[in-house]
Amino acid sequence: FTMVMPRFLGVDAVRNTPGLANANGFLEVDDSYQHPQYPNLYAAGVAVHVKPPGQTPVPCGVPKTGYPTEQMAKTAVRNIVADIKGLPKQHAKFDDMSAYCIMDTGNMGMVIVGDHMLSPREHEFIIPGPEAHWAKVAFEKYFLWSRRHAHV
């Protein structure tokens, strides 16, 4: 099974600001999610550039799902607080983050779990089926409800 998608680009405002991002419009950050040239700039999730673990015959990006995005954001926020309070920074390497994903594929879906986002992994499994689709639908409803009612 192969899925081919068009190249993903960052937003125009970031991509077109000299020195802010790479050619594709993704922000370069370190493991504290701080920009190397702009110390007051932190970024997380889809906005950041994550280096692929190796070269492939066909250029590909690195998936940035909700779970690692949340981990990046928590690290960035903790480091903003650390900057304000003069405390040491925390670091969270993308490669070391666990992989948790419920992917919707129409009327089906997949639950994906791994001990690391990127290879090499010691443990990983994928469970396809309609249950994953319904889990995704249920989680989306819960997530939106919880945010509307300030249950974070």
Where are the model-predicted features located?
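C-terminal, flexible cofactor-proximal segment of oxidoreductases
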Residues: 75-152
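FAD-site-proximal beta/loop scaffold in flavoenzymes
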Residues: 1, 5-71
